[in-house]
């Protein structure tokens, strides 16, 4: 599978966004001293889901799939902001 400039650029954007989202949730979990083994906690489940999603080998994906993955991370970015902000307000 050929790697093009556009594909490499898309992968770099996804990597930056996914790291930002994952780190936001991880920092929340650590700062609130949540038990990472307690799968009944929404934040812990979200952290685990994001960790699994980061393990995808992006270089093995076709460009169209990269676009879908990018949209997934955009959605998780919005979702994590909403969830973590609601927790701060409550």
Swiss-Prot record:
GO terms for biological process: negative regulation of cell killing; response to toxic substance. Transmembrane segments: none annotated. SUPFAM superfamilies: Plasmid maintenance system epsilon/zeta, antidote epsilon subunit. Gene3D superfamilies: 1.10.8.130. GO terms for molecular function: toxic substance binding. Keywords: Plasmid, Toxin-antitoxin system. Antitoxin component of a type II toxin-antitoxin (TA) system. Neutralizes the toxic effect of zeta toxin. Part of a postsegregational killing (PSK) system involved in the killing of plasmid-free cells. Continuous synthesis of the epsilon antitoxin is required to counteract the zeta toxin. Belongs to the epsilon antitoxin family. In the presence of the zeta toxin, forms an inactive PezA(2)PezT(2) heterotetramer. This is Antitoxin epsilon 1.
